[in-house]
Amino acid sequence: MALVLKISGRVFDNEELVLKYAEILNKLPGRIAVVAGGGEVARRYIAVARKGGASNTFQDLLGIYASRLNALLLISLLKDAYAKVPRNMEEFLEAWGRSRIVVTGGFQPGQSTATVAALVAEAVRAAALLNAANIDAVYSDDPRKNPNATRLSELKYDEFERILRSSNLPGGYELIDTWAVSILKRSCITTYIFDGRTPEAIEAVVRGENPGSKITC
């Protein structure tokens, strides 16, 4: 059984949390693909580039390289991981054919790491995509601004798409983009969204539990 784990870049802003993820991934059985976000390094570099007038494409490249640096850090902590960070799908598939664990970051400008994770999950026919996010579950609205937002333990992709497209959700309500959702939906890949600060949730999913929100076709 193959799993894909998307780790929010914010996880990499916490050294102890990164070490805990590595500890858990080293213990997990089966095959695992991990996609790392860019985190504070990406935000800082992009902010400077934007201030200096760099193009959006160049800003995206900075985010991609930051995510690859985070991926390389995780690789250094894993026992069975492929030693290089794949830069595109072809390189990822080559690595996947050789190693039990493959860790990657962004692939190309204009494409989120969430979309990379969805494409990877589709390519390896993953049993599920696990999204270690900046929020503990999917809500009907942004719970940080709307105290009446409802926590949704289980939902379908159609409902999830409606929530993501809601005008009430600000950019800071980071879950996954609609392009990534469309990929997961077309291949009917189950997605789990949980709090990235609790890496133990990965083990919970493997045990058949739902630590946050479960999204299905």
UniProtKB/Swiss-Prot annotation:
Presence of the UniProt keyword Cytoplasm in the record: yes
Keywords: ATP-binding, Cytoplasm, Kinase, Nucleotide-binding, Pyrimidine biosynthesis, Transferase
GO MF term list: ATP binding; UMP kinase activity
Residues bound to UMP: G38, D60, F107, Q108, P109, G110, Q111, S112, T113
Modes of activity regulation: Inhibited by UTP.
Primary enzyme class: transferase
Enzyme Commission number: 2.7.4.22
Subunit structure: Homohexamer.
Family as reported in the entry's similarity comment: Belongs to the UMP kinase family.
Cited function: Catalyzes the reversible phosphorylation of UMP to UDP.
Name of the featured protein: Uridylate kinase
